[in-house]
Amino acid sequence: MSVSLSFAASATFGFRGGLGGFSRPAAAIKQWRCLPRIQCHSAEQSQSPLRRSGNYQPSIWTHDRIQSLTLSHTADEDDHGERIKLLKCQTNKLMEEKKGEVGEQLQLIDHLQQLGVAYHFKDEIKDTLRGFYASFEDISLQFKDNLHASALLFRLLRENGFSVSEDIFKKFKDDQKGQFEDRLQSQAEGLLSLYEASYLEKDGEELLHEAREFTTKHLKNLLEEEGSLKPGLIREQVAYALELPLNRRFQRLHTKWFIGAWQRDPTMDPALLLLAKLDFNALQNMYKRELNEVSRWWTDLGLPQKLPFFRDRLTENYLWAVVFAFEPDSWAFREMDTKTNCFITMIDDVYDVYGTLDELELFTDIMERWDVNAIDKLPEYMKICFLAVFNTVNDAGYEVMRDKGVNIIPYLKRAWAELCKMYMREARWYHTGYTPTLDEYLDGAWISISGALILSTAYCMGKDLTKEDLDKFSTYPSIVQPSCMLLRLHDDFGTSTEELARGDVQKAVQCCMHERKVPEAVAREHIKQVMEAKWRVLNGNRVAASSFEEYFQNVAINLPRAAQFFYGKGDGYANADGETQKQVMSLLIEPVQ
């Protein structure tokens, strides 16, 4: 069989040669032009293999719909920018005025974080918390009778990479009873702060584990007992926190909720509230522009039209990137991650649904070797898949080399090769009807969920990346595995029923049921315990030695938060209408008033 390709001139895939796969400028290289129109001519007709279908819904976010999104207050953007600058200056003055008042400083920092504007004051907050960390024992004594302040101090330090001991809460335990003091049971604010702090538990921290059980029980009692909690902000916060703790929430959506709740609090700061509103809407406009840009790229690429078997979810893929890193200076990562997410979905559907086993073996081999010269062995649709990934990775590698003088391509190649190898292993399991043990499944499932590729992309596209940072990435940092495992298990919880119906490999719950001969409810409870253990490991890795490490750790922590957002109530990724559409509207389209 002979195959010829007719390459359209509109969308260009650059063939990049050179040492280590490093990209050279497009003018100096040969070009592969293969999209959006591809014509395949066969010299002989052979019977097409039987293809499965995922029966996915088409995207509700068409290119025209995305391009029609309007920016809020566009005529006043310059004025809003000046107002934000003025309000930032006022907030800096406020931080100066509160020096020496530790409790008030802690409350202000907490408000800045929850209002989503702490990134404007990163250095000032870090310096303040560094001082608190140096005086931790003295401040702890100062707050010996104040549960709220003690828990807030503990949480803010841990959230920002300072390793502090759970022993700060021993003073709130009754030595004779061996449990938390009875007087705390009615302190709603203190209980709520301790509840949120308890979700930063590390391995072996029994006191925080006790604190979670204690606060959960008594916060529920306060909500249920008539007259215990009057209507107001604290009641809203308690109900909201019991649904999902702060440490596991999608930050931008939480910010929008908190702005709405805090503005009804009579003690709120009007200037700080205005800063949060203006900043939220300014970032929302930025996100709309970014989404417009990646939508043009996606439309020019033409993959959904040429390969209609996979899930076309550009807007959702961009939203993943916003969850990972929302700040303005992370656009390079958001752009590359959106593209990577699109390709992950495409290739995942090739392995899970569309490809034959023989085709998948060939594709895996070529991805491992990163060998563009071998693509003639592939069927036409796989050539398109390979070239899309190959050229996008190499183009990103060229830009990073040009701007920073470091070669990220080997690290992205490694991540793509590992992903495809794990996809291949699971495809063999499916085609042979094999059900692995839970440990055997999980051993590779944290790779096959694509988290390591996403985090490799985050690492390589970080704005402060240096050669020294890249050298450290020869092996994955310890935070990567628990982050990816949580992504995997959230995904399995939300999608396994639908994926099994399409013909996918057995997931964590089914592997546990098969191995232990237990019903689904028991298996799910066991997987929940595995997830809690991984959260403890993840929390234990929140110690950053540099701004770059802090950025990367934040992305790693946001990975399971994104999974909770998309899969907490089913498959909010594949089934992109309903709740997911509401959240997209809230974050990307509807400004705060």
Curated annotation (Swiss-Prot):
Q: Which pathway is this protein engaged in?
A: Secondary metabolite biosynthesis; terpenoid biosynthesis
Listed GO molecular functions?
A: gamma-terpinene synthase activity; magnesium ion binding; myrcene synthase activity; pinene synthase activity; sabinene synthase activity; terpene synthase activity
Where is this chain primarily localised? plastid
- Where, by residue number, does Mg(2+) 3 bind? D491, E499
Top EC group = lyase
What does UniProt note on temperature dependence for this protein?
Answer: Optimum temperature is 30 degrees Celsius.
- Any GO BP annotation: diterpenoid biosynthetic process
Compartment list: Plastid, Chloroplast
Q: What domain of life does the UniProt record list for this protein's source?
A: Eukaryota
Q: What are the GO cellular component annotations?
A: chloroplast
Please report, in chain numbering, the residue ranges of the motif DDXXD motif: 348-352
Question: So where does Mg(2+) 2 get bound?
Answer: D348, D352
The prosthetic group or cofactor this protein requires is: Mg(2+); Mn(2+)
Family from the record: Belongs to the terpene synthase family. Tpsa subfamily.
Q: What is known of its domains?
A: The Asp-Asp-Xaa-Xaa-Asp/Glu (DDXXD/E) motif is important for the catalytic activity, presumably through binding to Mg(2+).
Q: What is this protein called?
A: Monoterpene synthase 7, chloroplastic
- Its source organism is Hedychium coronarium
Q: Mind giving the lineage of the organism this protein is from?
A: Eukaryota, Viridiplantae, Streptophyta, Embryophyta, Tracheophyta
Which gene is the coding source of this polypeptide chain?
A: TPS7
